[in-house]
Structures are given as C-alpha cells and as structure tokens.
C-alpha cells in the first residue's frame, strides 16, 4: 500500500499568505521551459495546492542530467520510476543553496524575513542536514561510505519546509509513517527511528519559528537562536530514546491507524505528544529525558 498523499488525486497543502486574491504563478527560475512548475491558487483561506512531484521537480534542478526522469505523473511510494534521480547525492552547500534559492522564493519569505532570521533559518537547515548525515554515516558504519546525502533520504525531511498549518503538516507525516509497506526510505528500523525523531523535533522548531515569522501579531513567542540550536542537538538518537518510546507507544505500535485518534493524541499536551508545539513543554520533556 502506497502512501496516501502520493496518489494522483492528492496534493501537498501549503499555507501561503497571498497579497491579494489573484492566482499566483511561481515560475521555474532555473529552467528554460516557459511553463511554470507550480501553480498556486489563492483562495479565501490562502491555501495552495502543490503536488509532491512538483517538490521533487524543484530538487531535480540540482542535476540537469536527470532532466526528463520526473514525469507529469505523481510519484508512487516505491519511487521505482525515479530511482536514478533519487539515488543522486547533493552536498551541504547544494542543499543550503536550495533552501535559499528555492524554498525562500517558493514561500516568498525573502521579503518578510529579517536578515538575522534568514541566517538563523539557514543555520537550522544546515544543522538538520549535518545531523542526518552523521546518523547515516553511523548506519553505514564506514566513515567514508556515505559522505553525501541521497535525495531519497531527505525527501520526507524536505516536506517539512512547506509552511503548512500545524495539523496539515502532521497529516502528511501520518500518511507516510502509518504504512507498513514503507519501501526504500523507511525499510531500515534505525533510519526510520531517526526520521521519527527528526520529524518530532523539526516540526516543532519549524512550526514555532515560522509561525512566529508570519504571525507576529498573534503573540507567538520567538524561538531564540541558542534555544533552537539546543533543540537540534537532540537529533542524535541516543539522546532521544524516551522521546521515541513515547511517540512509538502512543501511535506507531498500534495495529490500526486512525487519523482522528492520532489528531487527539497530537493535541493532548498532558498525556500525548502535543507538547512539541509549545516551547515550555518540549523543554520540560527534554529535561526529563
């Protein structure tokens, strides 16, 4: 069974605060093709509809040799038609270039972010990349056997950069992780555990930080640079065993998966894991662990 949001009828929902009610078309800035990669439709709720394959197409611009491998058809969970592309690697510098030139352009954040916030956000991206690289090196045991991150290993991580509403972001990962048939990128228990940890921490960091950027009038407390970096240090699995246990026991070890049950667990601050949405809660939990 493939992941639900990879099916043809589904799409990634991205929260985009549009300046007006008109349709916004985001051009592919690095392609000679005149057709836009992503069409953004501004609605009264300012939701945009972007297929997952469009996100992959943005990544594809890193390597022109893969041109044409990604088709107009949405991706399937086994990534079988995209193996050549997804097996490509890219460096930290290339990834940060993607963050700056693609993600910031995509979300139109460059006009709303203060220079210091952009630096912190890029540093956050870099730290997450290096944490994933370190974990993958440990998994492959040999120091030099995995010095570049495969695109297939960072695909799910990249979705976190879409500025979704909180519950919409979590729904994407619910649809990924709930499937037993995890195929390539989730077949390793060690890597899957690490991605779960990454999901918990980075979703908290990104939701808190980026909601603050676009919702300053709502009184969301800023996440300081030092606090953000301290949270990133917990990306090492050895420091997150209790965190993983909480998450696994309340959701992933169940025989059946129901979105409404998961939503309740996620929003339950005291007995679930809704605490990751609040800075005081995550600090308390991390201190306990």
Where does each model-flagged region fall?
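EF-hand and EF-hand-like helix-loop-helix modules
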Residues: 42-43, 55-60, 95, 110-132, ...
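A glycine-rich, coil/turn loop motif that links secondary-structure elements
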Residues: 142-144, 184-185
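A positional/structural detector of protein chain ends, strongest at the extreme C-terminus
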Residues: 1-4, 287-289
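EF-hand Ca2+-binding helix-loop-helix modules
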Residues: 3-141, 151-179, 188
